[in-house]
Amino acid sequence: MEWLNVLESHGQALLGPVAWMVVWSLVKIVVIAVPIILCVAYLTYWERKMIGAMHVRLGPTRVGFKGLLQPFADVFKLLTKEVVVPSAANKVLFVVAPVVTLMPALAAWAVVPFGPEVVLANVNAGLLYIMAITSIGVYGVIVAGWASNSKYAFLGALRASAQMVSYELAIGFVLVSVLLVSGSLNMSEIVLGQGRGWFAERGLTFLSWNWLPLLPLFIIYVISAVAETNRHPFDVVEGESEIVAGHMVEYSGMAFALFFLGEYANMILLSCMAAIMFLGGWMSPIDIAPLNWIPGWIWLGIKTFCVVSMFVWFRASFPRYRYDQIMRLGWKIFIPLTGVWLVVLAIWMQTPWNIWR
């Protein structure tokens, strides 16, 4: 990272320390936010292609080679549509709600490590920051349902908020379990902790990652992440046969697109968190020279892509659950299970068989 130090010294000399700090912060935000938005655009393309393949269809093929420009066509379509604000709606809150939904999904990336030293803010409470910032998104959903002054929107917002809060508890217990075995809230240290152990010393790094000893928690985390993002088969929030588009039913144009962007950005974020906490983050699966030459951010991207593809696979494979089944799964199965596993881990770590020493 020598070139970064040179760039920083020249920037401070040219603009002054305060102005350079502001400019450099904006540059880092753009460098992270723009690729995330592009990833969201092409996640929609991959979702349609993957589901099409599972249904023995072609998916989008019209715009660009193999439909590669379809996401840009969708963005252009939404940009040209009128944003209609219902006459009975609270106009200020109606406009603010989509922004409140999207911003936490982008702000959370500030502490996500893409490599050993590639992170916007390497804070010691990174995991706590992620837990706090991602819980704010539910307020955008509640505000959207209330501000729309529509029965369908309000019912959808109630469903969404209850579902998101329920599964946030299960995810929270899983994160506490990872904190327990890692001994740190720092995201980079959580990744580095997975590179130690008997298997890692013999080059089989992928067997030292947390997914193996914490396999039940990994499964619970992935399913809870699907429910947290209101994705199929937990998408009763947008049940077309019941409440149409839920809290988004009165939105159109770019206001609707911001909700859409927030949902897919959360999918990528939670998938990246799964890669960091359970799949070794930026580390290669086997400690050999050809794989170690591949940059860490590529390994993190591959692992995130695999978890995101599981979201799409669930959508194409499973029928929608009833609302009462979703709440029962969260409160009566996942939360008690994660609580029990937390106790089991605490006891395990006090025994001679503690593998995280």
From Swiss-Prot:
Keywords: Cell inner membrane, Cell membrane, Membrane, NAD, Quinone, Translocase, Transmembrane, Transmembrane helix, Ubiquinone
Pfam families in the record: NADHdh
GO BP annotation list: aerobic respiration
TM segment ranges: 18-38, 92-112, 127-147, 165-185, 206-226, 268-288, 294-314, 329-349
InterPro entries: NADH_UbQ_OxRdtase_su1/FPO (IPR001694), NADH_UbQ_OxRdtase_su1_CS (IPR018086)
Catalytic activities: a quinone + NADH + 5 H(+)(in) = a quinol + NAD(+) + 4 H(+)(out)
Top-level taxonomic group: Bacteria
Major enzyme class: translocase
GO cellular component: plasma membrane
MF annotations from Gene Ontology: NADH dehydrogenase activity; oxidoreductase activity, acting on NAD(P)H, quinone or similar compound as acceptor; quinone binding
Chief site of localization: membrane
Its job: NDH-1 shuttles electrons from NADH, via FMN and iron-sulfur (Fe-S) centers, to quinones in the respiratory chain. The immediate electron acceptor for the enzyme in this species is believed to be ubiquinone. Couples the redox reaction to proton translocation (for every two electrons transferred, four hydrogen ions are translocated across the cytoplasmic membrane), and thus conserves the redox energy in a proton gradient. This subunit may bind ubiquinone.
Xref: HAMAP family: NDH1_NuoH
Protein name per Swiss-Prot or TrEMBL: NADH-quinone oxidoreductase subunit H
Species for this entry: Bordetella pertussis (strain Tohama I / ATCC BAA-589 / NCTC 13251)
